Structure formats: structure tokens, C-alpha cells
Amino acid sequence: MSPLECSECFGDQLLHRTYTWQLTLHSRPNYTRKRDTRSESLEIPISVVLPQRGTAEPFPRLHNLYSTPRCAQQAALPRLSRRMASQHSYPLNRFSSVPLDPMERPMSQADLELDYNPPRVQLSDEMFVFQDGRWVNENCRLQSPYFSPSASFHHKLHHKRLAKECMLQEENKSLREENKALREENRMLSKENKILQVFWEEHKASLGREESRAPSPLLHKDSASLEVVKKDHVALQVPRGKEDSTLQLLREENRALQQLLEQKQAYWAQAEDTAAPAEESKPAPSPHEEPCSPGLLQDQGSGLSSRFEEPKGPPARQEDSKELRALRKMVSNMSGPSGEEEAKVGPGLPDGCQPLQLLREMRQALQALLKENRLLQEENRTLQVLRAEHRGFQEENKALWENNKLKLQQKLVIDTVTEVTARMEMLIEELYAFMPARSQDPKKPSRV
């Protein structure tokens, strides 16, 4: 080994020296292959640049043995053959395996910033790497404490990390897509839930309306008296300490009564609107209907119209006046004493007896109205049944009248035919009387 000086490799810095060692490797012939008894020898040049004492750079650096030579001395160095070329195109690894001074302790990679690509040899389909002064199989080699991981190892680690990151990104992307799909499905389900809730509320409201619909002519006619009761209840709804709970109950009852009144008014207005065109579309009774069934249709028509029209006649008016008087008396009993007692007692009542009494009376009145509502509903159903029967009777009477008319026409035709035949017989007899008697027994002609 002969050291060579190189002053042009690092930019005319004369304080650097370059040392080159020539390693020669002899291998035995491979007798396993037939006709292959050649021996192989490899020459490996190693060039190291070391600074002298007192230089500015504290660390030695290596030449890149496979780059373009920068000086004549470097160009004169022997090159590696093709079989000794590096198997990687990555930058040179850092090398600190061979100690420069055998008496000194080998320096670590942090102390020596040496770029070095370990030589590799491929023999019989196996790759060998020069490590720690000996050739080691690449698959079975161990990492030396003075050897840093190779570039391929770093590259593999980097690729493994990239692959893991790519896998994680793909998993995150798939999870985000699944989350997005689940959110869309959740939105659709929430919309369907809202639509179903709206339908359910509408269904409940329609059921409540059907149940609360009830004809109440008394409330329809005497709405003024109920308005007075409402005003009295509103006056009673002033907060008074102990009476707050009772007043709240009164408010709820008042709201229920208002809703019931509005529903009944709407129902009766609709019933009157439907009854008016039905009465207008009724066919006028023909004059021939009266002899067939004079009393049946008239009685049923009067009975039906009396329920849906305004009461006519003195008995109906007397009954309505009696009911109105009873209702007004009940309302006066509910509202009158409360006003007098409030005037006597004053704003602060010791206990809530008066509102409770008024609430009981209102409940009784509401129960009576509900009973009357049920009775009127039953009467309305019976009236509908009677109306259907009335229509059936009308059709039967019409058929009977047409049958009687046809019978009368048939009778008239028969009478006219008999009269014509009788006159023809009389004329034939007169003709035979004027004709001369040809024979004693003349034959009479047949009837025409």
C-alpha cells in the first residue's frame, strides 16, 4: 500500500492528503458447475482523504470512487470492473468501519463523516458485502456497532413508512366515505321521521276533530251568554297567591270550552251549508203522487226539515225558549254569585273555595253539553237513516205511480176497442137488414 497525495481534489487545499489502499480478493474455482474451473480475483481500491493538523475541517472525507475524476492522479487510480459495480444508485453511505490507526479506538459515525458505499460481489446467485474487513452474505450479515445502516436499509424503511402512510390514508379515505354515506342515510332517515311525525300529528288532529265534532244548537244560538262567561273567567284569572293553581285550572277549562264552541259552530255551519243545496235539489212532488201516497211523503219531509232548518211553529219555539232560559239561569248561577262575593270579600280571598265551586259547575255544564252532544249525534244518525228510507219510499212511490198510469192507459185502450167492436157489429146488422134475403139462413160475416 502506497499513499498518494492529491492536492487538486478539494479546491486547491494543500493541507489535505489522500491515501489509497488496494485490496485483492482471490476465490476458489466452483466445481459444482460443469466446465467451470476458473478462479476469480477482485481488486478493490479504497481512497481516503485525511486533513493534517491545524486545518479548518476537523473530519476526513472519502472520494467518490465511481464519479468522474477531478485530477490526473485520481484518473490514474484503478477502477472497479463491471462485476464490482455498485448495485444501488443511491448516494453513498457513511462509513466508519476500518480504523485509521490500530492503536486508537475506532471513531463512531458521528465523529467521522465519511461517505462510503460498501462493495458488493455476486457469486453463484448470492450477493456478498464487504463489512468489518471480511465478506459477508448480504442476507445473513449483522450490523456492526461501527457500521451505519446501508442506503438500501434506509430506503426500505422509507418505503415501508410510505406504504404504511398510504395504507392509512386509504383507510382514512374509505372511512370518510363510509361516514359520509352514513351521514346522508341519517339525514334521509331524519327527514322521513319528520314527515311521519307531521302525518301522525295531522292524523291525531283529524281524529280529535271527528271526536269533538258535535251539533249543539244551544251553543250556536246563545254565544253571547258564553262570551259573558268567558269575560267573567278572564276577570277571575288574576294571580292571587294561593289561587294560582285553581286559576290555572280555570284557564285550561276556558280554553277547552272555547275549542269546543268553535268546533261546534264550524260543524253546524257545515251542516247548514250541506242541507241548503239538498233541499234545493229535492224534486217537486208530481200531482199524480198524491192519490197513491198522500200522507207518507209529506210527514217524512216535514220531520226531516224540522231538524235542519230553523224551528217553525209555536211548540218548537216554546221548547227552545225553555232551553235558553235554563242555560241562562245556569250561567247566571255560575257568574253572578262569584261577582257578588268578590265585591264583598275583596281582592284577597282566604282560601280558593269560590273558584273551585265555579270550576265544578263548569264541569257539570260541560258534562251536560257532552251528553247532549252524544244524543244529537245519535239523532243525526237516525235522521240520516230516515233520509235514506225516505229516498227509497220516493222511488217506490214513483214506480207505483208509473204503474198506475200504465194501467189506466191500458184500461182506456181496452174500453175504446170494445166500443169500436160494438159499433161495427151494429153496422153489420144494419147492412144485412137492407140487403134482399137470398136465403133463409144467411151467414153472418166474421168480425173484423
UniProtKB/Swiss-Prot annotation:
Keywords: Coiled coil, Phosphoprotein. The keyword Repressor does not apply. Residues 164-198, 242-267, 356-414 form a coiled coil. It comes from Homo sapiens (Human). The keyword Phosphoprotein applies. Belongs to the chibby family. SPERT subfamily. One of its GO terms (cellular component) is cytoplasmic vesicle. The modification Phosphoserine is found at residues 41, 86, 89, 97, 124, 144, 148, 150, 212, 225, 335, 338. Testis-specific. GO terms for molecular function: identical protein binding. InterPro entries: Chibby_fam. It holds the Pfam family Chibby. Residues 279-291, 307-323 have a biased composition (Basic and acidic residues). This is Protein chibby homolog 2. PANTHER family: LEUCINE-RICH PROTEIN, PROTEIN CHIBBY HOMOLOG 2. Homodimer. Binds to NEK1. Residues 270-323 are annotated as: Disordered.
